[in-house]
Design a protein with these regions (language model features):
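Donor-nucleotide binding loops and adjacent catalytic segments primarily
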Residues: 44, 190-284
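Conserved nucleotide-sugar phosphate-binding/catalytic loop shared by glycosyltransferases and other
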Residues: 34-78, 88
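A donor-sugar binding/catalytic signature common to diverse glycosyltransferases
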Residues: 103-104, 111, 126, 152, ...
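C-terminal amphipathic helix plus adjacent low-complexity
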Residues: 341-388
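A nucleotide-sugar donor-handling region in carbohydrate enzymes
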Residues: 44-46, 149-221
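Active-site and donor-binding regions of nucleotide-sugar-utilizing enzymes
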Residues: 6, 10-13, 17-28, 65-170
Length: 388
């Protein structure tokens, strides 16, 4: 009997689980894969909705949990949480001894998993390398993960070329599309109206989703927030604020959003939604407003407009459904108004998403289940030097 491949996948929060859900489903079901799902960070935090429960509810399963997140709202707290994660994951991976570890995207917590994998000589597979988000530390994290990894699954061909330009051997780099788009193509989403009603919205009336996070590359990570709230104060329609990521400044975002919601009965603050409920709510929204990659990468797949505020997503590819705007109240108001015009709404129906077709999981599975995970994967070689 063929030995099963020991593959560990790390997940820290709803931010990456919404991408990983179908890949975890396929890995768990594959007869030649021994999957270990390791959850840590915000997943285990009651403050951020204890989203580890989403994994079990979706059938992904959780094999190991590692407590790592300090109760903090500072950059020092982030740095210390990273150290705690490194200690905890070192023990976990030393005991599990996976043959391959899968990390996703650009969350700073992933650096802990990558560092442990490096020192334990475990090959690393990285999903979503080569993307850009120049207004956050995520960009540097993503590039660091690329150089620490041995397999790369990129969202676009442009991202694939960037990874190769960083010195990675082309055979290691696979363009698969964005994993999160598999949420649209695999199974039917719950009715948007039903999800809206469950969180207190009037399903018959328009709603806007606001998804915004601290700009972690800035000293004042929430400097954009007053302009955002000023713009939203004159918006006609229901508003759903989604909790931010667990970064420095997140509590400021939560506090001000909650205060804003207290002044208007049509404003709701949601800690977390399961991935498919979030996608359903987004599919029925008038627009998504904020600085989340969800608007830039995902909204086009459900033909929804996105207003991208500020610098957090600078450099990231996006479709024509996205309207970029500086963090200025009047500019934000004008951008929202543009997305609600009849011509823009009509054009949305035919706008393409540059991040793929929603079949990324099956492409990743083909590589993970066939690639040689021996020494040839672990040992990387620099590209040949140009000769004069």
């Amino acid at each position: 009997m063929t030995n099963r491949r020991r593959i560990a996948v790390v997940t820290t929060s709803r931010a990456d689980f919404s991408h990983l859900q179908w890949l975890l489903h396929d890995l768990r079901a594959h007869p030649l894969v021994d999957l270990k799902v390791v959850a840590f960070g915000p997943h285990l935090s009651p403050e951020f909705g204890r989203t580890v429960d989403f994994l079990n509810d979706a059938g992904a399963g959780v094999d190991e949990t590692v407590e790592t997140l300090l109760s903090s709202d500072s950059d020092v707290g982030m740095a210390k949480s990273l150290g705690v994660a490194t200690l905890g994951l070192a023990d976990t991976f030393a005991r599990l001894r996976p043959e391959l570890i899968v990390v996703t995207a650009d969350r700073y917590e992933m650096l802990a998993a990558a560092s442990v994998a490096l020192t334990l000589r475990i090959p690393l597979a990285h999903i979503e390398g080569g993307d850009l988000s120049e207004g956050a530390i995520d960009d540097a994290v993503r590039n660091a993960l690329t150089k620490l990894s041995h397999l790369h699954f990129t969202t676009t061909d442009r991202a694939r070329r960037r990874v190769i330009a960083m010195g990675e051997e082309p055979w290691r780099v696979h363009c698969v599309g964005a994993l999160s788009l598999d949420q649209v193509t695999r199974g039917s989403l719950p009715p948007a109206g039903a999800v809206a009603a469950r969180i207190g919205l009037r399903p018959a009336d328009p709603w806007f989703i606001v998804a915004c996070h601290p700009e972690t590359l800035q000293v004042q990570t929430t400097a954009w927030l007053p302009a955002m709230l000023d713009a939203l104060a004159t918006l006609h329609g229901q508003i759903v604020f989604c909790f931010p990521n667990a970064d420095a400044g997140s509590r400021d975002v939560i506090a001000r959003a909650s205060e804003f919601a207290g002044t208007r009965p049509d404003v709701h603050v949601v800690v977390n939604l399961p991935p498919r409920e979030y996608w359903s709510l987004m599919s029925g929204a008038a627009a998504l407003v904020g600085n989340s990659s969800s608007g830039v990468m995902e909204a086009a797949s459900v033909h929804v407009a996105a207003v991208n505020v500020g610098s957090r997503q600078d450099g990231r590819e996006h479709g024509e459904n996205v309207v970029d705007t500086p963090a200025d109240a009047e500019a934000i108001r004008q951008a929202i108004a543009r997305t609600q015009s009849e011509s823009f709404q009509r054009a949305l129906k035919t706008m393409a998403n540059p991040y793929g077709d929603g079949h990324a999981a099956e492409r990743i599975m083909r590589v993970l289940t066939t690639v040689d995970i021996g020494a040839s994967l672990l040992v990387k070689h620099a590209p040949p030097r140009d000769t004069d």
